[in-house]
């Protein structure tokens, strides 16, 4: 076997011939074995292959070469015993190449199979390096006189076959050298036309190379010979496109194809198409697409009508259902004796309000009237049974009630009033107090008020309630009360100067502290007095205005008797001397259960109050607890025959007549309220009210309201908060900051000033005179 070099070696010398010695690499054992087994029997030479990488055909070709004898002699001169050294020097004693002194084609030729783009990168540097190594090695060999190692590998009487001579090297390299396989045709549709063009142009480049290197080394001639037989072994710029040279790729940027827009988009053209996309699509729309567009438009318009237009027209009352009119007419014809009055032409849709009438439909017929003090029957004008489950009372949620989100600082309460603590459940309105930290306060509770929504000027207000916790435990402050609409409960800026005034005179009673140095009053004076000057801020000049308070119930407990106590009172200003009214005109009906309160008032209000004991079963906890009891007030505001009567259950507790508030000292008559009165229900806790027995208050505690009902005399129905003779709406709208900002505690802090009066202001009034 002859050895083919698989490495890249280039050699250059002055004789244009560098021979690489072919080394036999037999091991010591193999040499001894072959010495005996390969000994010719007839004296002929034995063919011994020096290259294990050649097949038998290649071996025969090499062995039969005409220059075999010369090559065998060259091979025997330099040989190694058994070691293999993988140096690239052709004259190394371990080289795998045969000595090719007479082969000009082999001189400087890289024997790698690959002759493409990447093979030419370091061609020049490789030649220089190999030439340098070759010259150094030749100098070493020439200086050596020891030829023993050259003949060491040559067996006695045997000659190794030599490589072909230099004359046949070109034929050998063209026919026997392993060439690069043809490239994989990634684009089979390219066709032979482009292949032929590529071959033709490649051959032209090769010919130009030959002419340029006519006087060059034999290495260039050999490269040309190899390249002429293999298109892809030339020094071409190969691209990754299936093996084709990039310069011969069939497409250029100037050529156009139908699918160019997929892989080579035109930015300007795409921008033009984007701007005209809708118009072009609409212009080329087929029948099916047009019908689809109409369907989408129809669904869009239908959605607008159903979810926007229809709710708007039904909420505004534009849509008037004839079925509703027919039902109303039928109901009217069946009860010809019943007279009904329409409050408004507005038609409330079912989803916009829970109710469409002032009287709750759940109110039983037996509760439609109430017997007054004089024996007359007053009509039910408003009721709320709270039977609708899950009502909420955030601002704007309910027609009649609002749950404020405030701290009630007027009485230094320990809780925060939150709308979250108010709801309806099991047919009752629940005000729940729990030990829940809220706004840096440790308790949360609820309040509802009908301020500026539902008011009344006279009548009977009845509330059925179950009071919180145990009846014998003191500390909680449940309240059911009314106050004039000019003051909003919990908003101190709005109540300054109007609470609890009910006064129509222009004297010391309207001045700060009632002009008394003994501290009987700390009030700032009546802000809206009867003698307010012209062009001053007043809702209706010439009328004394205020916000008096009437308490239906304020709950507490008698720890000695172990029962609950209801405080029922009228709170007014200005004050009597020592806060004492004329008790000759106060009537108590049962002294075993009711007595006048020893607390008659203080520097902020005069309280005409009585206390009544309550059954512990009317509370939330305790044996046989859970029962509801009704509490009520009934009053008329006539200056001569007016009165206020308080009730626990069906029985009156006491009555205050208008004459008990006659002039006293330097003040004039205090009047039973003619103001529109709003209703308030709340559950509070404060050290200003009673001793708090913390260990026996089992939070959470709940005050439950079964119903609220309002009765008024026939012909005197007034449930508005803005009556003609005592208006409030315009005045409130002019001072919204004071009525909607609970953090403001002073009228001037809200940005307003007290109006002047003719008594202290040095001005005049066209509506009132002192003489």
From Swiss-Prot:
Biased composition (Polar residues): 1-11
Keywords, ordered alphabetically: Cell wall biogenesis/degradation, Glycoprotein, Membrane, Phosphoprotein, Signal-anchor, Transmembrane, Transmembrane helix
GO terms for MF: glucosidase activity
Family: Belongs to the SKN1/KRE6 family.
Note: Present with 468 molecules/cell in log phase SD medium.
Cell compartment(s), UniProt: Membrane
One GO term (biological process): sphingolipid biosynthetic process
Record PTM Phosphoserine, positions in chain: 56, 65, 67, 92, 103, 142, 162, 165, 170, 176
Annotated function: Required for synthesis of the major beta-glucans of the yeast cell wall.
Cytoplasmic-facing ranges: 1-289
Name recorded for this polypeptide: Beta-glucan synthesis-associated protein SKN1
């Amino acid at each position: 076997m002859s050895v083919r070099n698989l490495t890249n070696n280039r050699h250059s010398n002055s004789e244009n011939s560098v021979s690489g010695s072919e080394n036999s690499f037999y091991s010591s054992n193999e040499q001894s074995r072959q010495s005996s087994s390969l000994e010719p029997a007839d004296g002929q030479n034995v063919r011994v292959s020096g290259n294990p990488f050649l097949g038998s055909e290649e071996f025969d070709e090499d062995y039969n070469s005409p220059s075999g004898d010369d090559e065998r002699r060259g091979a025997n001169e330099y040989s190694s015993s058994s070691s293999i050294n993988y140096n690239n020097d052709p004259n190394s004693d371990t080289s795998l190449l045969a000595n090719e002194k007479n082969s000009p084609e082999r001189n400087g030729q890289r024997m790698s199979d690959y002759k493409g783009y990447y093979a030419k990168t370091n061609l020049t540097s490789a030649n220089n390096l190999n030439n340098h190594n070759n010259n150094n090695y030749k100098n070493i060999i020439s200086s050596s006189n020891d030829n023993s190692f050259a003949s060491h590998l040559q067996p006695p009487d045997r000659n190794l076959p030599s490589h072909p001579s230099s004359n046949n090297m070109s034929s050998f390299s063209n026919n026997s050298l392993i060439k690069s396989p043809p490239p994989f045709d990634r684009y089979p549709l390219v066709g032979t036309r482009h292949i032929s063009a590529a071959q033709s142009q490649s051959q032209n480049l090769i010919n130009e190379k030959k002419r340029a290197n006519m006087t060059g080394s034999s290495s260039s001639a050999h490269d040309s010979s190899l390249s002429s037989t293999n298109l892809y072994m030339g020094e071409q710029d190969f691209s990754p496109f299936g093996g084709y040279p990039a310069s011969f790729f069939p497409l250029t940027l100037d050529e156009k194809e139908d699918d160019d827009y997929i892989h080579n988009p035109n930015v300007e053209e795409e921008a033009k198409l984007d701007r005209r996309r809708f118009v072009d699509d609409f212009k080329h729309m087929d029948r099916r697409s047009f019908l689809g567009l109409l369907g989408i438009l129809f669904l869009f318009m239908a959605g607008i009508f159903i979810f926007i237009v229809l709710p708007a027209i039904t909420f505004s009352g534009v849509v008037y259902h004839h079925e509703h009119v027919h039902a109303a007419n039928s109901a009217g014809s069946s009860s010809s004796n019943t007279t009904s009055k329409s409050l408004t032409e507005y038609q409330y849709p079912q989803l916009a309000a829970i109710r469409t009438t002032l009287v709750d439909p759940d109110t039983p017929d037996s509760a439609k009237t109430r017997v007054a003090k004089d024996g007359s029957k007053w009509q039910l004008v408003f009721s709320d049974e709270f039977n609708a489950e899950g009502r909420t009372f955030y601002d704007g949620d309910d027609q009649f009630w609002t749950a404020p989100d405030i701290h009630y600082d007027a009485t230094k309460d320990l809780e925060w009033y939150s709308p979250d603590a108010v709801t309806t459940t099991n047919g009752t309105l629940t005000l729940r107090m729990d030990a829940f930290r809220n706004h840096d306060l440790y308790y949360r509770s609820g309040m509802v008020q009908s301020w500026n929504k539902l008011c009344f000027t006279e009548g009977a207000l009845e509330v059925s309630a179950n009071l919180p916790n145990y009846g014998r435990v003191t500390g909680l402050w449940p309240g059911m009360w009314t106050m004039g609409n000019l003051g909003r409960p919990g908003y101190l800026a709005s109540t300054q100067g109007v609470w609890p005034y009910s006064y129509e005179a222009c004297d010391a009673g309207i001045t700060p502290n009632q002009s008394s140095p003994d501290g009987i009053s700390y009030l700032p004076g009546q802000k809206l007095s009867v003698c307010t000057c012209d062009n001053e801020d007043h809702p209706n000049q010439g009328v004394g205005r205020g916000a008096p308070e009437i308490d239906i119930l304020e709950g507490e407990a008698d720890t000695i008797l172990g029962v609950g106590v209801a405080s029922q009172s009228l709170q007014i200003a200005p004050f009597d001397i020592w806060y004492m009214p004329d008790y000759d005109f106060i009537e108590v009906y049962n002294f075993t259960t009711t007595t006048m309160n020893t607390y008659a008032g203080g520097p902020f209000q005069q309280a005409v109050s009585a206390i009544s004991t309550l059954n512990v079963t009317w509370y939330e906890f305790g044996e046989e607890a859970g029962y509801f009891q009704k509490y009520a007030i009934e009053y008329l505001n006539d200056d001569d025959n007016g009165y206020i009567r308080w009730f626990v259950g069906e029985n009156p507790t006491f009555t205050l007549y208008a004459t008990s508030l006659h002039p006293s000292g330097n003040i004039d008559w205090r009047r039973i309220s003619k103001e529109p009165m709003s209703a308030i229900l709340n559950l509070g806790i404060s050290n200003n009210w009673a001793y708090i027995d913390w260990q026996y208050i089992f939070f959470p505690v709940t005050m439950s309201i079964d119903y609220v009902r309002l009765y008024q005399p026939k012909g005197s129905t007034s449930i508005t908060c803005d009556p003609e003779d005592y208006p409030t709406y315009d005045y409130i709208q002019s001072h919204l900051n004071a009525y909607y900002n609970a953090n403001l505690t002073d009228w001037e802090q809200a940005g307003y000033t007290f109006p002047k009066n003719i008594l202290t202001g040095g001005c005049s009034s066209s509506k009132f005179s002192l003489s």
